């Protein structure tokens, strides 16, 4: 037997295994993001959340318009529609074609025009023109999913809720704060572990952060103040 080969085998080193990541400091991360995003424009839905008159309804309409649409187009379409009609009754009185012409810049504008008109009719029929405050009632409205409902609850009514869009879902998985496959699963995980003081703000913080720095394709990690905190899970390419 070749003793040299046996010695070579005995000297073979085992590569160290990567250990578990330490708990992610979500409060510190959000504090850093909060400071960072002050120089960026906030999401249009957040802007409309400060509308002095009928904020919940304005948030509802702007969020329905925002789905799969850039903020610039959402902002312009929301302004045109709400300048023409800014109550459920006023919008319900418009022809569907009129709504289409006012919001044509947004994606799927024909589908959204139909959903918005139908939602306004439902608000009049079932809620005396008021925008509901509960997830159950909001989800009954045409064209309204959990993201829109949570934004109406948090920004429109100022009540506890967690809105999770694709940016929030993606970034929290990069941070390793959650390990989830869908935005809805992320929302449910956050309801179990995210401190309540961060519930309302997290969507605005991470959407702005995701639009400007932690981008879906090639995030700008070289300029990110979270470098020491972020494990960059799943990030294959960055700048």
PLM regions and their residue ranges:
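Catalytic cores of DNA base-excision repair glycosylases
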Residues: 13-239
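Short Lys/Arg-rich cationic patches that frequently serve as NLS/NoLS or arginine-rich RNA/DNA-binding motifs
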Residues: 1-18
């Amino acid at each position: 037997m070749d003793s040299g080969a046996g010695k070579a085998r005995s000297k073979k080193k085992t590569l160290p295994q990567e250990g578990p990541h330490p708990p992610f400091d979500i409060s510190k991360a959000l504090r850093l993001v909060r400071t960072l995003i002050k120089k960026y424009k906030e999401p249009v839905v957040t802007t409309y959340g400060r509308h002095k008159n009928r904020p919940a309804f304005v948030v509802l309409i702007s969020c329905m318009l925002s789905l799969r649409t850039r903020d610039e187009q959402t902002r312009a379409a929301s302004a045109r529609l709400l300048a023409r009609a800014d109550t459920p009754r006023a919008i319900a009185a418009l022809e569907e074609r009129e709504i289409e012409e006012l919001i044509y810049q947004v994606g799927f504008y024909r589908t959204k025009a139909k959903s918005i008109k139908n939602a306004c009719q439902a608000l009049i029929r079932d809620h005396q023109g008021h925008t509901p405050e509960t997830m159950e009632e909001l989800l009954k409205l045409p064209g309204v999913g959990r993201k829109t409902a949570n934004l109406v609850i948090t920004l429109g009514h100022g009540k506890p809720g967690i809105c999770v869009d694709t940016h929030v879902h993606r970034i929290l998985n990069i941070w390793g704060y959650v390990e989830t496959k869908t935005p809805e699963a992320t929302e449910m995980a956050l309801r179990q572990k995210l401190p309540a003081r961060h519930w309302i703000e997290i969507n605005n913080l991470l959407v702005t952060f995701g639009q400007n720095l932690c981008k879906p394709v090639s995030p700008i990690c070289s300029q990110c103040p979270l470098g020491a905190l972020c494990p960059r899970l799943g990030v294959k390419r960055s700048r």
